[in-house]
UniProtKB/Swiss-Prot annotation:
GO terms for molecular function: ribosomal large subunit binding. This is Ribosome-recycling factor. GO terms for biological process: cytoplasmic translational termination. Belongs to the RRF family. Pfam families: RRF. Transmembrane segments: none annotated. Its main location: cytoplasm. Keywords: Cytoplasm, Protein biosynthesis. It is found in: Cytoplasm. One of its GO terms (cellular component) is cytosol. InterPro entries: Ribosome_recyc_fac (IPR002661), Ribosome_recyc_fac_dom (IPR023584), RRF_sf (IPR036191). Responsible for the release of ribosomes from messenger RNA at the termination of protein biosynthesis. May increase the efficiency of translation by recycling ribosomes from one round of translation to another. The keyword Cytoplasm applies.
Length: 186
């Protein structure tokens, strides 16, 4: 690996780790209705499992309700089954091709559990960032050992990698803090 590409590659890997965290945090339920809450729902349709968003339109008419407008009338029971199997803790009311999902208020205890889960996701992401940093430093050591870079370059690049790691680590902290505020807001 070339020294010029190393930092860029590490940055791309760290960016992917942050995206994964973002997707995990989207799946955590806050007190407000969000269509992202249904991202994990798959529906048995046309002989395979497909995401709910490919057979219905999703909307949030108010802060406590998600509407699922199924496009094909024959798919309504499959969509209901998919929502039930996803085990989201939601009950649904079906009216023709419209499925309403009322979002119950979170208890204080459940909010605290979700905050703990968000912090766990954050810590897992930080571990990924540290592993990416470690891999980058090991690559630098190989480059130095093979006399591709000199010791000064090694120290300079390792400091840059550390700064990059710190930058992404602070992004994790701010994402977790923001999600915690969303969860704890009643």
């Amino acid at each position: 690996m070339e020294k010029d590409n190393l930092k860029k590659i590490l940055q791309e890997k760290m960016e992917k780790a942050i995206k994964v965290l973002g997707n995990e945090l989207k799946g955590l339920r806050t007190g407000r209705a969000s269509i992202n809450f249904l991202d994990s729902v798959t529906v048995e349709a046309y002989g395979s499992k497909i995401p709910l968003s490919q057979v219905a339109s999703l909307s949030t008419p108010d802060a406590r309700t998600i509407n699922v407008q199924v496009w094909d009338k024959s798919m309504v029971s499959s969509v209901e089954k998919g929502i039930t199997i996803a085990n989201l803790g939601l009950t649904h009311a079906t009216d023709g091709q419209l499925i309403r999902l009322p979002i119950p208020s979170l208890t204080e205890e459940r909010r605290k559990e979700l905050v703990k889960l968000a912090h766990k996701y954050g810590e897992e992401t930080k571990i990924s960032l540290r592993n990416i940093r470690r891999d980058g430093i090991e690559e630098l050591k190989k480059l130095e050992k093979d006399n591709i870079i000199v010791k000064d370059e090694y120290h300079n690049l390792s400091e840059q990698i550390q700064k990059l790691t710190d930058e992404y680590s602070s992004k994790v902290d701010s994402a977790i803090k923001q999600k915690e505020q969303e969860i704890m807001t009643v």
